[in-house]
Amino acid sequence: MSDLISALLLGILEGLTEFLPISSTGHLLIAEQWLGRRSDFFNIVIQAGAILAICLALRQRLWTLATGLGERDNRDYVLKVSVAFLVTAVVGLIVRKAGWQLPETLQPVAWALLIGGVWMLVAEHVAGKLPERDVVTWKVAIAVGLAQVVAGVFPGTSRSASTIFIAMLLGLSRRSAAADFVFMVGIPTMFAASGYALLEMYKEGGFGTEHWADVAVAFVAATITGFVVVKWLLSYIKKHRFTVFAVYRIVLGAALLLWLPAAAG
């Protein structure tokens, strides 16, 4: 398989999995077993494509918030998004400096996929018994910020899965409202994470040699696919539960745990 086709597939995979509650990190690690491992810079660029995708998909919502800060509800919402991001940034930096992160290898990812799928089924069942609410509380904002850190510590957890369901359990029980808030918090979080990673790479001597055609193709693929996925998901969860994603995670995690010993042998 050519490097260009491999880059295209990895870009599509990033766009497909970044915003679905199934773990983009886990899927990229799995794909790299067959498509080859790419540089950290390549992975940052395709995530940048996902960032652009969500900004485009939510552009109307972002514009409404930006131009409506004179309204109390909009100011309150933006402030809670900011607090959630700051919690992630501060706690995440402490965790990173302390070195608290599992290695990005297939076995912990497989367990995270499996356990995360079970967690999703249980969490949505419990949240389904709560009164339907779409108001973001301070408790939800802080918890979402912490949940993003947890997702960073345990590769394969999925940022969207951990944050959406903790928000639902703590009172933001309407699925679409929880996803909307989580995606809003995800925008500055992903920007900051990518910027920090680029800065660290620069300090370590630069970005190395890249095939820029591969990088460009992957970026565009991640952007287009991510845009479609965000639009589809926000429409889908208005009428459907997350069950299909939970079952998919359980099946994939179990399959990986069965495959790994055979592959090692």
UniProtKB/Swiss-Prot annotation:
The chain crosses the membrane at residues 38-58, 75-95, 108-128, 135-155, 181-201, 215-235, 244-264. It comes from the Bacteria. InterPro entries: UppP. It is found in: Cell inner membrane. GO terms for biological process: cell wall organization; peptidoglycan biosynthetic process; regulation of cell shape; response to antibiotic. Its EC number is 3.6.1.27. One of its GO terms (molecular function) is undecaprenyl-diphosphatase activity. It holds the Pfam family BacA. Keywords: Antibiotic resistance, Cell inner membrane, Cell membrane, Cell shape, Cell wall biogenesis/degradation, Hydrolase, Membrane, Peptidoglycan synthesis, Transmembrane, Transmembrane helix. GO terms for cellular component: plasma membrane. Catalyzes the dephosphorylation of undecaprenyl diphosphate (UPP). Confers resistance to bacitracin. HAMAP family: Undec_diphosphatase (MF_01006). Belongs to the UppP family. This is Undecaprenyl-diphosphatase. It comes from Xanthomonas oryzae pv. oryzae (strain KACC10331 / KXO85).
